[in-house]
Amino acid sequence: MKVLIKSAWGSGQPTEASFPFHHANAFAEAGHQVQVFLLGEAVSLMRTVVANAVVPVGWAPLSEALAKVIAHRVPIHV
């Protein structure tokens, strides 16, 4: 299945901002073709300093999820 995940959540909402990346990892690990599309505030999450500072409640830090997304070779469109 092909999946496109879009998000506009930025660092001000760390839990919501991390969901697209955690979901992308789950889809990729299940064998689906997945892409992430970021718009608005979410674009800032691609800055290393911002990604390192985003720690969602009850989930792994965004930097860890982002590293997995990159390892899965999931395209991220900004």
Language-model features, listed with the residues they occupy:
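Short, catalytically relevant binding-site loops at active-site mouths
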Residues: G10-G12, E41-S44
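Histidine-anchored nucleotide/phosphate-binding helix
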Residues: A17-A30, V36
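Glycine-centered flexibility sites
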Residues: G31, G40-A42, G58
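Short internal beta-strands
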Residues: V34-L39, I76-V78
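N-terminal beta-loop-helix "entrance" segment that forms/cooperates
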Residues: A42-P56
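A glycine-rich helix N-cap at a beta->alpha junction
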Residues: N52-V78
